[in-house]
């Protein structure tokens, strides 16, 4: 799917246009963020989760017009993408599974098993 960056002259609102986006590549193209397909292929879920995390921290943007929101969304997506250009998923620890401590080891003696 070829996606065009958002235009304020469009018949669609920003939210309506974003409803059509289905992949990380769609988001990157829509927001005009240049990307390396190899980076996205390996890190797409991490990039999108980091983008979501950045959006959550940005607070409520609904009071702003589409053009201002587009600029903020674009900046945050570019930042999320660059996190994985400059680093990797294991280092960035976006998902909980990467932040978990080592599994706990418990010793059970033979005596305990036999009793």
From Swiss-Prot:
InterPro entries, per database record: NifW
Keywords: Nitrogen fixation
Keyword Isomerase: no
Record-level GO BP terms: nitrogen fixation
Disulfide linkage: none
Keyword Secreted among record annotations: no
Subunit structure: Homotrimer; associates with NifD.
Family: Belongs to the NifW family.
Function summary: May protect the nitrogenase Fe-Mo protein from oxidative damage.
Name the UniProt record assigns to this protein: Nitrogenase-stabilizing/protective protein NifW
Native source species: Azotobacter vinelandii
């Amino acid at each position: 799917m070829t996606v065009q960056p958002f235009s304020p002259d469009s018949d669609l609102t920003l939210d309506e246009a974003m409803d059509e986006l289905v992949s990380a590549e769609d988001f990157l193209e829509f927001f005009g963020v240049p990307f390396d397909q190899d980076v996205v292929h390996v890190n797409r879920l991490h990039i999108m989760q980091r983008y979501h995390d950045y959006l959550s921290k940005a607070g409520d943007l609904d009071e702003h017009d589409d053009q201002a929101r587009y600029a903020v969304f674009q900046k945050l997506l570019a930042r999320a993408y660059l996190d994985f250009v400059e680093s990797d998923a294991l280092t960035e620890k976006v998902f909980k599974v990467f932040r978990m401590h080592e599994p706990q080891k418990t010793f059970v003696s033979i005596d305990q098993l036999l009793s």
